[in-house]
């Protein structure tokens, strides 16, 4: 019901916004999510794309998220959106390093950067039990990257409501969520 309500809301573009880039930012946000799912092996037979460097591809596409945030904050021509973008990017970049380091453990254990190869290498025992510290670090870094509690400062309702996407509404706002 909430999704339907969001899709039917009026889509407003701010007066001083760079309209092309303002409209491009939600598309970049949605495209990065779809591109990340392309290399995830669901079953041995259902793989979008089995690239040999799946982990590197996954992290590179995830890093594009900082670009979409900066574009969204800057293109709306709102100083609060820009400040929210700066704050969000600072948080995302600070947790990027632990996320990459925790992903290196399964890569080293499996001897491959292919997500399919890493999945197959865990046939006997999951790496969660072999490297619990790396698994916990990956979990915490992912909480921070996705903005879940206790790292939900990205929208900081007590400071700047909605952060970088303060000017977005309707369908465009939904593409960020």
Where in this protein do the model-derived segments appear?
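Selective transmembrane helix interface/packing segments
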Residues: 1-177
């Amino acid at each position: 019901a909430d999704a339907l309500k969001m899709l039917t809301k009026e889509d407003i573009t701010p007066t001083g916004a760079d309209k092309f880039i303002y409209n491009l930012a939600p598309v970049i946000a949605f495209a990065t999510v779809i591109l990340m799912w392309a290399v995830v092996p669901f079953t041995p037979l259902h793989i979008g794309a089995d690239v040999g460097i799946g982990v590197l591809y996954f992290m590179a596409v995830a890093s594009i998220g900082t670009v979409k945030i900066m574009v969204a904050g800057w293109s709306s021509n709102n100083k609060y959106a820009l400040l929210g973008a700066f704050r969000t990017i600072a948080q995302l970049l600070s947790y990027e390093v632990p996320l990459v380091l925790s992903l290196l453990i399964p890569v080293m254990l499996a001897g491959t950067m292919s997500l399919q190869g890493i999945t197959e290498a865990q046939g006997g025992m999951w790496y969660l039990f072999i490297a619990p510290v790396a698994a916990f670090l990956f979990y915490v870094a992912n909480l921070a990257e996705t903005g879940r509690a206790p790292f939900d400062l990205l929208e900081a309702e007590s400071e700047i409501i909605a952060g970088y996407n303060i000017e977005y509404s309707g369908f465009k706002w939904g593409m960020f969520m």
